[in-house]
Amino acid sequence: MLFKISLKNIRKSLKDYTVYFFTLILGVAIFYVFNAIDSQSVMLDVRANMMDIIKLMNDMLSGVSVFVSCILGFLIIYASRFLIKRRNKEFGIYLTLGMSKRKISVILFFETLLIGIVSLVAGLVIGTILSQFMSVIVANMFDADMTKFKFIFSMKACVKTLIYFAIMYVLVMIFNTFSISRCKLIDLLNAGKKTEKVTMKNSIICTIVFVIGVGILSYAYWMVTRGVRTLNTFDKIGIPIALGCVATFLIFWSVSGFMIRIFTSIKSVYYKGVNSFVLRQFCSKINTTVFSTTVICIMLFITISVLSAALSMKDSLSKDLDSMCPVDVQLAKYSYDAMSEAYATSQDMSEKDREMLEDSKLSIIETLNNSGFDAQKYFKDVAEYNIYNTGLTVKDTLGDINTDDYKFMADTIMPVMTIGDYNSVARLYGNSTYELNDDEYIIVADYKNMVMVRNQALKKGITLSVNGKEYKPRYNECKDGFVQIGVLNMNDGILVVPDNAVKPQQVRNMGLSADYRADTKEERYSIETQLDNLMKNISYQTSFISWNSRIDLAESSVGLGALVTFIALYLGIIFLISSAAILALRELSDSADNKERYGMLRKLGVDERMIDMALFKQIGIFFAFPLILALIHSVFGIKFINIILATMGMSSMAASIGLTLAFVAVIYGGYFLITYLCSRSIIRPVR
């Protein structure tokens, strides 16, 4: 009997449950999709190093899922609160007819169970379909062989989804039971006659608070842009964040009175059509949702900023790979003179240390050949070079230029190369080569922030003393270039001098850049594997040698890009649907409560088109308000993130911002449209 009542109630209130159903199904689908990546990655044919990166990504996503489940759990309980409130009169009738509160709780239990089962089944079906597309995206990201691709259903992700959402629904059932047990019959029966207590705030006080909020927010914006130099520790970064949250709350608390004061003074706008009705409705609503609107605004801000940053990082890590990694492999090794100096103060050298010191007398190719790796057989287009330590520091090359931002590297030894060595590397990389007179030097750099500082010094014609001889700059600016392969422009400066400017005993590092003698990807992987196995045995075991490769850098950049993108997408979608769902549920509840007010408009002669437009404006303003402030926050948040990314040599976020805004518009706009259509259905008279 109670089960039949529950089933009938769900059918009858289907339009009230539309947003709730939509959110639950979407939440289940997203939860399954991101947790199914673990099972789908098993079928990817990738190297062991790449599989380790994928495993790390899956572990991170699993941890994020715990946080996501808390967000969704809060959302479901919040939604249940509104749905129960909508049905207070119905529950009052049940009690009047003699039904006990325990039986009402059982009805709610069955309703929650049915909704849970339907949403889980529908969400898992949609999630399974979407996960197949996710498999293709993951495979493309990691450049995996798709020959083993097949339709896959992740039982592990399914069980995890069922467990997590089962816990959420149990909490909802407990909450519903608790809510019903506290209800009084008189309150339930009079629920439709009661309106939420709304206190219209003093407009003068609101204006003052609004100005204070804007002032605090302006200072927070200044801190993350012009005053960014003061934010040199993590705890200091929290200051503008805290100020922004407080200012956001103050703005939402005061905006109703502020808007009333502004618009009532503009008679032509206030009394046009039903604008006065729309404004009063919005202001009364914002007065009772200050905290939740603040939270929604902050979640939208986090979504826009984090997703833009993640997509920008992914693009920056992958787009310059070919130009920044023009060779297949690069090896480096400490020289004998450098290591002899390091061991000079050591009183007791082990046998292993003596062997490594002896090996430092050999070239990189000799070390490889002695270890069983035939460099001539596996390498081609080889460029060998030396990095020298002449005692010059970064501060010496900058002279009296203000280096407050780079104090930490002022005493760093300036790497020096001869023009002959640099040109041999540049020719191999396809970069520009240069010529020098006997008394000239060049600074080669590509890290933009440091290039700007160095250019100031070069324009002043700062002379440098190397081994007792003075050298002047050949150019009044840095020349673009690099020696160390990587994925970002992080060369903060190499001093290039004539071949006779340095001494052999000043060699600090030996370097080698080369391509593999291979024609296919398989052959490259084969050589890479042999070299990798060798390096595991000799790198800092029998030799002061290290290495890097294009394949390894590509895998690392792709892995990091995928990691930040998936986590940002996961959190972004959840934050978006949570924010939009809370607004939608609140609006639907208010539409039901205000049905009589819209009926009054009809009695006053307002036609349906104007009523629909009034509803559209009201819902539009309610949805737009937190979004507009979040977008303003994001402008300054993204500027701050741009500064951080620039210090890592990453590019602008312009392209990723557009993609993020489109993503927000689709999900947030979709909820707005559903809310408007459902609200319009609620307020229209029954025919």
Segment roles from a protein language model:
Residues 14-20, 108-126, 162, 166, ...:
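Selective transmembrane-helix segments that form parts of the transport pathway or gating/packing helices
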Residues 34-35, 65-92, 104, 176, ...:
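A hydrophobic alpha-helix feature that marks transmembrane segments and, especially
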Residues 29-43, 78-82, 115-144, 157-182, ...:
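Small-residue-rich transmembrane alpha-helices
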Residues 15-22, 33-67, 83-85, 227-247, ...:
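Peri-transmembrane interface segments
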